[in-house]
Amino acid sequence: MGSFLRSLRRDVGPPTPSVGATPAKKEPPVPPVTPLEKMLQDMGAIREDGSDKFFGMENYGNTCYCNSILQCLYYSVPFREAVVNYPTRTPIESLEAALANTLRYQNFAANLEAEALAEKQKAANAQRPGAPPNQPQKPEDKDSPEYKKKMALQTLPLLETKNNATSYGMSESLFTSLKDLFESVVASQSRIGIIRPQHFLDVLRREHEMFRTAMHQDAHEFLNLLLNEVVANVEAEASKQPEPERSLPPAESADSTELSGSSGSKTPNTTRWVHELFEGTLTSETQCLTCEKVSQRDEVFLDLSVDLEQHSSVTSCLRKFSAEEMLCERNKFHCDNCGGLQEAEKRMKIKRLPRILALHLKRFKYTEDLQRLQKLFHRVVYPYHLRLFNTTDDAEDPDRLYELYAVVVHIGGGPYHGHYVAIIKTQDRGWLLFDDEMVEPVDKNYVRNFFGDRPGLACAYVLFYQETTLEAVMKEQEQENMDLNTSVADINDSTLKQNGYPLSPGLAHVHSASQIPSPSEPARFSNLQRAPTAPPLFPHPEHADSESSPADPSTTASATPPVPPIPDIHSLPLSPKKSDSHFKKERAKEEKERKANEKEKEKQRRRDQEARIREQRREDAEIRAALEASKASKAEEDRRHSPDDTKKSSHGLSRLKRGSKSFSHRLGKDKENRVSSSSHSATPIAEHPPSRNGASESQQQLPNGQSPGSHGLHTRHTGLDEERDTLKDPKHDRSGHHGKWRSFSLKKKSFSILS
């Protein structure tokens, strides 16, 4: 029996195809379903206002700054409606006819075949003699942003824009190219795709030379330039039109009218719609401290730039922005009332609040030590809802409430390199991450990951707030609680619903769980996989506090699902064109520069401290010497003004001068007598010895408290007085030789005193 079965197996072979049978066709590859497509599965009909379109933008080499700002402006509902409706809204039929040539759908199978053919060609070239050895390639990471962007370019529809300025009745400008972008997305019959903003970039680089290079640009500078260019283009075209045409309002469709009533936006019939949306008014109040007169000066702004402090919030930064500033010393204020420079106090307040508030966090600061800009990784907390307090007393609607709807994030260690992404809140589909060609849904708490802490982390750079009402905020919170309660109650589902749409277990940015374990089985919690596409930060500490504090499960259902770990920042490349190793090298270099800078600052601080100590010691020595000299001069001054000194000074040098003059006069009169008695010389020398001996004798008996010099001077003065008394005696006039030798003796004394 066994031999029969073995022979039967040998006889039975694989079935041979018949001669006339056709081979079975190979099934074409199906592109993978993206998380965005899963989110849009339950969407209804396509809207005509463009609020349900989610297109990525192709990066043409460091153009992420442009893509992130354009995405934020497109999802600013009143701004998008104003751009589309000015000067008139293009009919939808014309747009659909134009999109028939500009919207191109991808052939995924053809792209795969072309990619496989390119790989074979590359391998064949490597096998040629003399060719360098082919390096083994690592398998592609399907969770990396580069792979997702490549798949998006191969599978999603590509939308190219053309110049339609003539249909608007305007000349080509940056505004018309922006209008081309917005209208193409609004009129598209596909909800997802990729825009190619090549025409917009061509106009931008043609009109502004600074954007012609492939260097890293600043997103905030581009936002400010774009808004000012839109204002200039609109006003320039309006000035060319006659007055009656400018006064006529443009035609409105029923859909646009309905949207305007619901969102609060109006179809622009003037050229000031950009000012009405983004423009605010700042008031500079300056109070003179001399006359206490307050002067005010108004200035407009399209975005508000605030300085940052470590471990602060947007509210504290705004408080510092409006803090009082003392104008003194070289920065005094010229008061017109006082007519000169005076000390004053200055502060900045907001007089008119904009409908859309663009807050620029000044992350890049110029440092004198490095002689270049440096990125500040300060932790600055920004809220979902904001109410400004630094308004003037006569401000319009000072209690206006704002809600956060877009965040532009800068990823990188410095201002000269890095990458920009945008996180935007849509009307009814929650928050989305726009990373050039890739668009993915994220959770609401994901927005809180960009407060900023240390080098290497992604930080929020520009915050977009739009006006809202308290009723809308309460309604939104109720809807979020209802959605969260529904997701918690649906335990048997395999996916967790957040923001009202189902998510797959492998979604990187939403961090959804495949199964919610019961509270009685805590050991069944599994570690979630980390996603390299999300710029990570640590979870906000307030969330942990909310989990630890007891609350009502009906209102605080967020405690049931655990907060997923934030992905590691090392897995996110610095830019789409840079590898992880290059990013690590740059970060190590920046860390080394930072440590060297800190060490140099510490050395400089020590040197400055030693110099201050030496200077302080020198000043103390000078002060002590000055005090000693002051004491000595005070004692000398006291001795001079004493009664004895006054008496001595009356018989001092002044008397000597008068005596010398009288002697000279006397000698001039008795010249003949002195000449006739020149032979008598011995007797006066014996009677009047030199004054030196007398001075030395008197120095041996000094009274207490007198110096030898002062006593000698007093003795000499006394001798002079005695000689003058002797000369004044009439009996001395009889012998001329006494007068001669006494005069000689007086000259000797005068010489000794002067010497």
Swiss-Prot record:
It comes from the Eukaryota. Residues 581-630 form a coiled coil. Residues 1-32, 119-146, 237-270, 495-755 are annotated as: Disordered. Its EC number is 3.4.19.12. Transmembrane segments: none annotated. It catalyses: Thiol-dependent hydrolysis of ester, thioester, amide, peptide and isopeptide bonds formed by the C-terminal Gly of ubiquitin (a 76-residue protein attached to proteins as an intracellular targeting signal). Ubiquitin thioesterase component of the regulatory network controlling carbon source utilization through ubiquitination and deubiquitination involving creA, creB, creC, creD and acrB. Deubiquitinates the creA catabolic repressor and the quinate permease qutD. Also plays a role in response to carbon starvation and the control of extracellular proteases activity. PANTHER family: RE52890P, UBIQUITIN CARBOXYL-TERMINAL HYDROLASE. This is Probable ubiquitin carboxyl-terminal hydrolase creB.
